[in-house]
């Protein structure tokens, strides 16, 4: 992946929408999660058939190249996140942090045991606002489905705005020193609360309202 310039590298990873040139990316294994293996095989085949639109790579092939994963996600509009052994994948959070719309394939990924609302109710209270849930009838041609969404500029703006709002609340190493010192990140980051701030605030509100014992 090439260099997009100093402005791209100095901005928070969830910014830089103008640098995105890849429709979708999938980084993972076909065999991870026996129940979802057919879905993963289908996704990989769909990506391999349309290489100009989709980046696909084995997680093992780049497991020691974290920056490569970040670069791919930062250049992609959509990040394909089929469920594995659990509904919620780490890649979903990597995608959000990089401003890449998580593409989900099961309603369980939006709720229920292991889903967003239960595990991350304070950090991601409205996961549907920043993700795409692909209907089962469109999963065999997921890139065609996403291409239609990408052409809807208003919807894309809403998705990207939701990602920018949520991403700072998922990290702990928030660049507050940059904000205080007027560094390169100050204008974009605006010193939003980080993950710990959000958790403590949510717990305090729950205690006040009697929702947390």
Place the predicted regions along the sequence by residue:
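Conserved active-site segments centered on acidic
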Residues: 1-49, 202-203, 207-211
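Alpha-helical scaffolding within the catalytic cores
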Residues: 7-11, 64, 114-121
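Donor nucleotide-activated moiety binding/catalytic core segment of transferases
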Residues: 9-19, 38-101
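Short conserved micro-motifs at the rims of enzyme active sites and ligand-binding pockets
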Residues: 35-38, 142-147, 174-176
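Membrane-interface amphipathic segments in extracytoplasmic regions
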Residues: 58-59, 66-67, 146, 171, ...
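Short, solvent-exposed turn/loop segments enriched in Gly/Ser/Thr/Pro and often Arg
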Residues: 59-60, 107-109, 199
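Catalytic binding pocket for nucleotide-activated donors in carbohydrate/polymer assembly enzymes
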Residues: 74-171, 181-185, 189
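C-terminal alpha-helical cap of glycosyltransferases
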Residues: 174-213
